[in-house]
Amino acid sequence: MNKKQLHDLRKDLQIIFQDPFSSLNPLMSIGEIIGEPLRIHAKAQSRAELDKEVSRLMDVVGLSARLFNAYPHELDGGRRQRVGIARALSLQPQFIVCDEPVSSLDVSIQAQVLNLLKDLQAEFHLTYLFITHDLSVVKFFSDKIAVMYLGQLVETADSAELFRQPLHPYSQALLSAIPIPSSRQKMQRVKLIGELQSPIDPEPGCRFAKRCLYAREGCTGRDLALRDFGSGHFCACCRAGALEEQTPSK
């Protein structure tokens, strides 16, 4: 992809960064930060038109107009992240990568930002790729889920289906670790064993095998492809679908 193609792609594809503190230029005002993509892509014919669009975007994400000339250090984490969201929306993209957008925020602010992202998705018909380690956020936010382990895709399914019936042992371990208030609904904890292998130079085969209680000889030595288990549920595990009948090997 050449420079021009990448420039054009950015109009449709934007990103909301994890850290609202380091992703904003401290030397630029809030108005300048939000307006920068509009200026680069010549989306405004005049300074007045640019300022008007920036003000509109600030209103969309719930930022007061009085912050137009403020600087990032004057804002708390939640409002800084709203600036990042407004900047991502400025070019009217179709696809936004949300890279752990609430993980660095206070818990009291996380719900506000998540609800804002949900509302914006409905209003502007956005598609999100939402990257997170927080399974509660995943359940609240996602229509489809892809589970990765050491850079390897191990399971994909609709959100409700994966939470109802996880097939991969790693997915089962993740879901079993979610705290559930009701003692009647507790899921049996799946404990992991062993050490992580190097993600830089992984051994062939399932990268989870050395930590899996159900691993057998066929799990190593060759990479495992995703298999279709119906209803859009895919899993890269040679023992998926029969784990309940198996005895852990370790």
Outline where the language-model segments fall.
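P-loop NTP-binding/switch modules centered on Walker-like glycine-rich loops
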Residues: 101, 105, 109-187
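Hydrophobic anchor residue at the start of the ABC signature
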Residues: 34, 85, 109, 113
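Conserved ABC ATPase "signature" region
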Residues: 48-66, 172-176
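Conserved ABC ATPase signature
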Residues: 71-75, 79
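A short, proline-enriched helix->beta-strand linker immediately N-terminal to the Walker B motif
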Residues: 90-94
